Amino acid sequence: MLETVTDVASFVHYGNTSVFPTADNSSEIIPDGESNISKPHRCLQVLYDDIGTSRVRYWDVMLLIPNVAFLVFLMWKLPSARAKIRLTSSPIFVAFYILVFVVAAVGITRAIVSMTVSTSSAATLIDKVLWEITRFFLLAIELSVIILGLAFGHLESKSSIKRVLAITAVLSLAYSITQGTLEIRFPDKHLSAKDFNIYGHGGRHFWLASSCFFFLVYSLIVILPKTPIRERISLPSKRSFYVYSGILALLNLVQGLGSALLCADIIEGLCCVDVTTFLYFSVFAPLIYVTFLKGFFGSEPKILFSYKSQIDEPEDSDVHLPHTSSSGLGRKDLDRGSYSSTQIDGSGAYLDDVVSGPFGGAHSINSVDSDRWRSINT
C-alpha cells in the first residue's frame, strides 16, 4: 500500500496527468491535501505549457524573442560593422562578429522548428537534436572566446584562429554527443510531462558535473591576475574580459546548485536551472558583443581612417628625424602641413621639445622669428 501511494504522488508531482483511485483500490489510498495534487510544479509546467489552443510553447517564445531582437540589432549595425572590420588587421574581431551571428541564428532556428513540430515521439526526438545542435554551437563559441581572450595578443594570423576554432569544435562535438546520448537513451524522468519528454540537458547528474567544471574554469580565470602566474605569462588587461568570466562563473554556480537540488529530489531546484537556461540561451550572444565588440564598433570610422593616414605617410620626416635648425624646413613641408591641421595641433608641442632639445629655445619651431621665415619664403 505504501508503494502505491508513493508512485501516485511522485507521478502527479512531475507529470501533467491526475491519477485517481479506482473502485478496486480506493480503500487502499487515503487522499489528503498533499497527495491529491493535480498539477505539476510551476517550474516544470513553464517548460511545456502551450499558448492557448496552439501547439506553441511559452518557453520557445521566451527564448525566441531575445534572439530575434539581437539579430535585428546585428543586421542594423551590419553596414557600419563591415566598414570598420575592413580597417582592422586583427582577424579576432572578424571571428567574434561571425560567432555572435551564428549564435543568434541557431537560437532562432531551434525555437522556430520546435514550434512547428507536434508532440509525437519523433517530434520529441527532433526537438532534442535541435537543442544539442544549439548547445554545440554555443559551447564551441564559449570555448573559442576563452582561448582567444586569453591569447588575444598571441594569435595574429588567420591560420591560428582557424586552428583554435577547429580544436574547440572537436571538444564541443564530443561534449554534445555525450550529452545527446544521455538525453535520448536515458531521459530524466523528472522532466516528463504528458507524452512529451522535455529536454533535460543530459540529466541531473551530467548537468551537475558540467556546471561544476565550468564554474571552476571561469573562477580560475577571474583570479588569475591575483596569482603569481601573472608574472610568467601575458594575461588580458581588459577588465571586461574578467567581468564576462565572472558572470559565467556565477551562472554555472547557480545552475550547479539547481542541479544538486534536483539530484536530491528537490523539485524547486528546477526553478534555478530554468533561470540559468533562459539566460544562457538568450543573453550569451549579447554578452559576447558587449564584452569584445561594443568598444570596437562604437568608435567613429573617421578616427580609424585619420589614424591610418597619419602612420602611413612616408614623407613625414619632421617627426621621425627632426632637424636641428628651422632653416631645414622647406616650402614643400610647410605647404603639406597647411591641410593637416590635426597633425600640427596634436604634435606641435612635441616637435618644439624635440627640436629645441639640447640646442636651446633659439631653434624652436614656435620661436622662429618672422624674418627667418620671410627669407625662406622668398
Swiss-Prot record:
Question: Topology versus the membrane, per the UniProt entry?
Answer: Multi-pass membrane protein
Instruction: Give the record's GO CC terms.
Output: plasma membrane
Record keyword Iron present: no
One GO biological process term: G protein-coupled receptor signaling pathway
Note down the stretches annotated as region Disordered: 316-335
One GO MF term: G protein-coupled receptor activity
**Annotated glycosylation sites:** N16, N25, N36
Supply the alphabetized keyword list.
Answer: Glycoprotein, Membrane, Transmembrane, Transmembrane helix
Which cysteines are cross-linked by disulfides? Answer: none
Which compartments is it annotated to reside in? Membrane
Transmembrane spans = 61-81, 88-108, 136-156, 164-184, 205-225, 247-267, 278-298
Please name the Pfam families in this protein's record. Tmemb_40 (PF10160)
| Taxonomy, superkingdom | Eukaryota
Q: Which family does it belong to?
A: Belongs to the UPF0359 family.
Q: What is this protein called?
A: Transmembrane protein adipocyte-associated 1 homolog
Organism of origin = Danio rerio (Zebrafish)
What is the organism lineage in this UniProt record?
A: Eukaryota, Metazoa, Chordata, Craniata, Vertebrata
